A protein has these predicted regions:
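A structured binding-face within diverse protein domains that lines the active/interaction site
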Residues: 1-152
Length: 152
């Protein structure tokens, strides 16, 4: 077992919307990337179960303002490592205090880009391994509608 890097170009997080005057929750997935869909690494942990089988988990932490707006029910976000900290994360010689410090300072400062996508990613039998799944759709939550006019 140990620490690892998990390569990605984007990820999905659910946004929860409750229409005013109701108690019915609706979830809408959002696709989140770095600018220009630049590749990045999540901070991960792995376990080797046998010679051919590993398990992996992505570390999460309290959401920043942007991610709290998107993942508004649990207010968590994955730890996206800034480039300067990627090698540090997999250094086997780090002690527990160094690891904790790294977790608090290593999140990327790049602005995250996001847009709502189809609920099809939640459906069984739908091929989600296609570029169409990443296309923007209208936001169900008016507060999240980037196209609506603002007063400021």
């Amino acid at each position: 077992s140990g620490r690892c890097l998990i390569l990605a170009d984007g990820f999905f997080e659910p946004h929860t919307y409750v229409k005013p005057g109701t108690k019915t929750e609706k979830k809408q997935p959002y696709y989140i990337t770095l600018p220009e869909q630049k590749l990045f690494y999540f901070a991960g942990l792995f376990n080797k179960l046998d010679e051919e089988l590993y398990t992996v988990t992505i570390l999460t932490l309290d959401a920043n303002d942007t991610m709290a707006k998107i993942h508004n029910a649990k207010k968590r976000m994955p730890l996206i490592l800034d480039e300067q900290f990627q090698e540090n994360w997999i250094d086997p010689d780090l002690n527990e205090n160094q690891i904790k410090e790294l977790i608090t300072v290593s999140f990327t400062n790049e602005a995250l880009k996001y847009h709502p996508v189809s609920n099809a990613i939640y459906k069984r039998g739908v091929d989600t391994n296609t570029p169409d799944i990443l296309k923007a759709v209208p936001a169900i939550d008016p507060e999240m509608d980037e196209s609506r006019p603002t007063l400021f």
